[in-house]
Amino acid sequence: MTLSRRVLVGTGAGLAAGVATVAVLALTAPLGKLERSSPVVLDRHGVWLRALLVEDGRWRLRADLDRTDPIFIRRLIALEDSHFWIHPGVDPAALARAAASDLKAGRVRSGGSTLTMQLARRLEPQPRTLPAKAIEAARAVGLEARLGKRGVLAAYLTLAPYGGSLEGVRAASLAYFGHEPSTLTNAEQALLIAIPQAPELRRPDRHPLAAKRARAAVLHRLVLKGLISAKAAREAAAEPIPRRMVFPERAWAAAGELARAASPTQPTVVSTIEAPLQARLEALAAQTGAGQGEQSSVAIVVVDTATRAVRAIVSSAGRDRPGGWVDATRALRSPGSSLKPFIYAFAFEQGLAAPETKLADAPVAYAGYEPENFDRTFHGEVTAAQALQNSLNVPAVAMLAKVGPEAFQARLESTGARLVRPKAAANDPGLALALGGEGVTLRDLAMLYAALGDHGLARPLTWTQLQLRSDRAEGSRLVSAEAADQVLSILRESPPPPGRAPPALSAGAPKLAFKTGTSYGFRDAVAAGVGDGWTVVVWTGRPDGGVRPGMTGREAALPLLFQVFDVLEANAPQAQTLTPQVAPPALAQLDSRGGPQMLFPPDGASVMVDSYGPQSRGLALAARGDRLRWYVDGQPLAEADGQVVWRPEYPGFYRIAAVDDHGRHATARVRIK
């Protein structure tokens, strides 16, 4: 074999080995980063509650092509990779031009990278060298084979760098514009195309002038390609550069738990929480905490009694306050007297007493344990109902002695609730349970009270819409329906807080069954209530367990409980106050040649609906005009049986439009309550 032939063979073998090595690298392009995206928790209607960073400290939100502005996608491809839909991952012509430029310069300085090659680089960054470029090209071909075009595009839009900790078009759109990228303005699209080319140098929050120049350059290129008019480009270029917004963190503690439990394959969790209700109660908690002193905190749990869906959960009065990062809904705190209703319920069920049974409120001792009432007085003979309504301690301890403290605790814990005794004294037979001698979480207390509200049937709380839709167990019987209903009937006649009318004088108002609790040393103030389909438990106290002299459940927690029910009542769907389903005949005869005219709902209206979503009766929209098409916030509505019925998904403001065949339209901005 001649020398030249040996050289050729050696060169060919080396080239083959190189190609094989590159091929292996392409086939093993790591997808781990793509599989790790930020878990996002939404409210029941899809409103953002909270997201978490991925392990490497990035906001990485998985992109959805079907929910990304298609015009933005077309413009991105036109400017960044015009042959995207036809090349195999590498654009040979662009790569050849870039290679020639790079060889001439002796280093990588020119582009030529397709979106797929950029994706390969994002998945595993390589040094900017010619061999690294070859690896990226080979991996791009492999990625195309593995993911397909739509998969590659979705992956690129998930990992594209947008400065700082932001990755992907969703994170950037939410951080800079405050909304999902489903609909983007010309200015927003241009900025999202410009930033990834130099993400740190073009960060709008740190380098607004550079971001503005880069956006203008993209707009100019769009004009040259005929993808936008010069006038529209000038208008977009004149818009201010946005600043970075803080991501929402509603229901921060509970949403954080749900996010951490999310599956890597399903990083989005739709919770049962109502975002508008959550926001109102967080504000109420902050106001209440401020009114009770700098060291005080507040917690609230709101449960839909029928489904056990947690509709709102407030963990503190604010994380900017002392101890504000402590989730008080999970902390073991003394329930005070708030477990007394269950003592009486078990006693009624077992025939040990009835609501009108006479009980002695007098001094008594149990192996050295001598309970006394909160007011340090005894009231003689009282009925069981009176003892419960006035939270008398001595009769409650007597009832617990008959029921048996161990049996009482076992019955409560059979629901999944956990009662923890801090330190049992030698002379304490467990009767202190009646007065809050064992700790319980606010979440478990809500579960127990929801069982009372559901005729004695216990079920765990529900946190996600997926759980709500799935088949659920029948639940467990905590107490008989008759006993549970008797206890609630008694509690409905309890003395209301100052400033509230007694139940007998509030005909027509929802009847609220409630009980308060105050722990030893005024450390915890608790109030729990059941009424109008809701179970609510509130707590106020110091996160560090400190004493708050005079802050009882009745004084510190009960007013808050009633305020929460006020919010729930104000939030409740009412009968529709505007109900014309079709245009009156006289109006229907009017000439419509002047364009559509909105008839129902009128502009500026506030409309009460019976419920939200598919179960709602809906609103029949009406307008004067011919061959109308209807839109709500830009989304088309379908016509059925000659009518267009709109079923709002959640309360808030909406823009309704009716458009005729000539493009003329009538609009109404309405508020749904």
Predicted regions and their residues:
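Active-site SXXK
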Residues: 76-77, 81, 222, 281, ...
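A penicillin-recognizing enzyme superfamily signal
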Residues: 271-292, 300-302, 313, 320-328, ...
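Soluble, non-transmembrane domains of envelope/secretory-pathway proteins that act on or interact
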Residues: 1-11, 19-23, 28, 228, ...
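Juxtamembrane regions of bacterial inner-membrane/periplasmic proteins
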Residues: 1-294, 305-311, 316, 362, ...
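Active-site loop and adjoining helix of the penicillin-binding protein/serine DD-peptidase-beta-lactamase fold
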Residues: 196-214, 265-277, 320-361, 365, ...
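Conserved catalytic neighborhood of penicillin-recognizing serine enzymes
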Residues: 104-128, 245-260, 353-408, 454, ...
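Short, well-structured active-site flanking segments
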Residues: 85-94, 167-170, 230-232, 325, ...
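Mid-domain, small-residue-enriched loop/turn segments at the edges of structured enzyme/sensor domains
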Residues: 370-373, 404-449, 456-457, 462
